[in-house]
Amino acid sequence: MKRRQFLSRVTGATASVVALAQQRSLARIQAEAAASSGAAIKIDPAPRFEISPHLYMQFMEPLGVTDPSVEAAWDYETDNWRKDFIETTRDLAPGMMRFGGLVSRYYKWREGVGPPSKRPLYRNYVWGGKETHRVGAHEFVDFCGRVGAESLYCVNFVGDGDKRYAKTREGDRTGDAREAADWVSYANDPEHAERKANGASNPLKIQFWQLGNETSYGNACFKKEEAIKTTIDFAKAMRERDRTIKLIGWGDSGWAGDLIDRAGEHIDYVAVHMMGQTPLSSDTVLRGNRYQSDPERAWNELMGLIGPRIERKLLELEDSLAKHQSKHGIAITEGHLSLAPHNSNPILTEWLTGVYHARVMNLYQRHGATVKIATAADFNGTRWTTNALIHQVPGGVSYLLPSGTVMRLFKRHNGTHGVSVESKPSNLDLAASRTGDKIFLHVANMNYSGASEATFAVNGMTVTSGRVVEISSEDPRQQISPLNPTVFAPQEHSLPQAEVLRWRFPARSVSVVELDCRKAS
């Protein structure tokens, strides 16, 4: 070996040793700072579970005259989806799009395929008015493909047992297991003649199907035993047509354990809805416009809802599944903050609700070992403030309400695996994840009036740099509307370089912190 080569290799090896020593020293400094500080975010980077790509899903339902959702999203001039609607939804980046809800009790899928001019109108019994069927299975699947979402359909589950829909003036609007199985064949059989005749030579590839929607709610639908038997009948019939499909059974209202015991082998997920996100106090300011005179009290009420209204239900469901030795994923296919007036309280257009929705999605992600499908809002419409996305009518802009803005931020900046938060400032609500050597922190500052500062440390790793993608507003009552559709656009900041990186989270802010790390040894 030549002397120059020898010196070069020795120098390189020495530099590597020095760099490694510096990394270990810096990791130790960061760990010591975390141990001595009451304001440290300390992460255990060991992967705990894989984060589902469907965790941030959305839910589309034709809502008749109540809120023209699907109809208002279709541009009849171009005979296509509205361009602004597609662009805003693509930016929202839902991993899954569900079509159904209460409308599935009288939805007849075959009426929505074939030439649009020949598709019949149908009455929307729950939400009023009539639907045109201009958006059927082909158009919905096309929409999902254009926005990058997996398709999920609710089948007509014999009208969920509600006999009203078997005897309407328009005839029997319920659907049986054969009808659902025929839908699976139409969608997924590569050689299906009817689908090909309707212009789709390739399968629609609908892999996810929900059996039952709010079947356990009220007294008009199936009782538990009948619902479970019907679930088995549907699952068998549908899987005879395509064994690769994923099926979601209804397990809310304490039904999950018995559903798993009797039908567990036939389904892949257990569905619940996180409804009932209602005020705890009868003297609430979260009713009508009362919050406007005392926004801080409204904030405090919102912060107090998540434990008793959402977390308790989730923990009870997880406990039930564990007792029945179930490995089925949880599918929270609907759920939103429910305030008077029904689904239209203006507070949901204001940043007062941003942190609330961030905490809800953080809760679901922290439970990502079991929660595989989830949302924090309805999806689209023109009037309901429980939506994630609003579109002007008859045309104009589409924009995201605070719930949608938060889901967009967290979905677009997230890791592949959940990791643990060992310590954090008490004012911050966190969910942490990891992809390779990058750590992602979803942070909601629960402090109404003050900023919260934090340092960062990762066990066994050195945090070398990072950035913050942040949504904040000086005005807690900042409202979004067609006049300011980008008011909640996230702002990006680099973390200031230092041995110990730190950030000051503004009051009421929602942020993602991305930490670039290196192994310390």
Task: For each feature predicted by the language model, list its residue ranges.
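Acidic, Ser/Thr/Pro-rich beta/coil linker or hinge segments at domain junctions
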Residues: 461-505
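Aromatic/acidic polysaccharide-binding cleft in carbohydrate-active enzymes
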Residues: 331-408, 414, 418-430
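Carbohydrate-binding surface patches
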Residues: 427-462, 468-471, 511-514
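Noncatalytic carbohydrate-binding groove/subsite architecture in carbohydrate-active enzymes
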Residues: 224-354
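N-terminal catalytic cores of secreted or lumenal carbohydrate-active enzymes
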Residues: 35-284
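N-terminal export signals
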Residues: 5-27
